[in-house]
């Protein structure tokens, strides 16, 4: 087994002191992380890490594709695919690993075209953000991409899935995304990815009136 030790100390703060490799596969590895809490007590944590990280800004990209067409409501493009760890179909943003020497923006456009067939333009790219920090150290860039639906190449897009990838492209209206996610999840017994659902919630709250503050009596 592989163990990495740290000799640094930081009183009053959390500090990882060692990471012991338990098992490793092609894509992920399982480690026992030993750390010190602010009181000086040593604790352990079971951690999953990707084996593909090589000094990149993040492991992957998650793409928020917004389809814009003349005389149509804006739509969000999602992909439905079977996820073995969940044992069910999931509704997600297009996503994938960043390849060596590739920028997050280039990776986002590549993954979007491969998984949905659409070609777009990057509107914004987030810094690296964590995916599931209680379980793994996986990080991603969230990249918003606009798609010109009037462009001839985007009228009948053809996905280019890789080996073993079986996806269904789903377009949902942006102005009613949360309601449509709930309905689709119930009808097709789908599990909606947390990032997609959080985006739907954010859109709903952004377009609704502010939460009312309870009247204070003196």
Swiss-Prot record:
Transmembrane segments: none annotated. InterPro entries: Nudix_hydrolase (IPR020476), NUDIX_hydrolase-like_dom_sf (IPR015797), NUDIX_hydrolase_CS (IPR020084), NUDIX_hydrolase_dom (IPR000086). Mg(2+) 2 binds at residue 111. GO terms for biological process: ATP generation from poly-ADP-D-ribose; chromatin remodeling; D-ribose catabolic process; nucleobase-containing compound metabolic process; ribonucleoside diphosphate catabolic process. Widely expressed. Most abundant in liver. Keywords: Acetylation, Hydrolase, Isopeptide bond, Magnesium, Metal-binding, Nucleus, Phosphoprotein, RNA-binding, Transferase, Ubl conjugation. Substrate binds at residues 27, 45-46, 83, 97, 132. Phosphorylation at Thr-44 is required for homodimer stability; dephosphorylation results in destabilization of the homodimer. Dephosphorylation at Thr-44 promotes the ATP-synthesis activity. The modification Phosphoserine is found at residue 10. Its EC number is 3.6.1.13, 3.6.1.58, 2.7.7.96. The keyword Metal-binding applies. The modification Phosphothreonine is found at residue 44. The modification N6-acetyllysine is found at residues 209, 217. Binds 3 Mg(2+) ions per subunit. Mg(2+) 1 binds at residues 95, 115. SUPFAM superfamilies: Nudix. GO terms for cellular component: nucleus. Its cofactor is Mg(2+). The modification N-acetylmethionine is found at residue 1. GO terms for molecular function: 8-oxo-dGDP phosphatase activity; ADP-ribose diphosphatase activity; ADP-sugar diphosphatase activity; magnesium ion binding; nucleoside diphosphate phosphatase activity; nucleotidyltransferase activity; protein homodimerization activity; snoRNA binding. Gene3D superfamilies: Nucleoside Triphosphate Pyrophosphohydrolase. It is found in: Nucleus. Homodimer. Interacts with PARG. PANTHER family: ADP-SUGAR PYROPHOSPHATASE, UDP/ADP-SUGAR PYROPHOSPHATASE. Enzyme that can either act as an ADP-sugar pyrophosphatase in absence of diphosphate or catalyze the synthesis of ATP in presence of diphosphate. In absence of diphosphate, hydrolyzes with similar activities various modified nucleoside diphosphates such as ADP-ribose, ADP-mannose, ADP-glucose, 8-oxo-GDP and 8-oxo-dGDP. Can also hydrolyze other nucleotide sugars with low activity. In presence of diphosphate, mediates the synthesis of ATP in the nucleus by catalyzing the conversion of ADP-ribose to ATP and ribose 5-phosphate. Nuclear ATP synthesis takes place when dephosphorylated at Thr-44. This is ADP-sugar pyrophosphatase. It comes from Mus musculus (Mouse). The gene is Nudt5.
